Amino acid sequence: MLKVTIIGVDLAKNVFQLHGATADGKVVFRKKLTRPLFERFMAGHHPCTVAMEASAGAHHWARKFTRYGYQVRLIAPHYVKPFLKRQKNDAADAEAIVEAALRPTMR
């Protein structure tokens, strides 16, 4: 079984899209979760790196994930956009966030 080392999260009002990957970028899971399920999933998952686009709600989640033991990376949206491979949707955004976060030179 592949070990998840990074989770890309596309934040939205009601539904969150998650993209879990290994350190070399292999996809382990793609999930779409509601707010309560998202919190429960993250509380029960082993701590790893969580990457999100920096937005108003991202700071709230970053504080919460830090308390759970996760390492959090907030990435500016204009650094994520070049990594989109297909039409913009929540799943593609979560994947692009992981791609951007895996880059060694990403701020």
Segment roles from a protein language model:
Residues M1-R107:
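Phosphate- and other anionic-substrate recognition elements at nucleic-acid/protein interfaces
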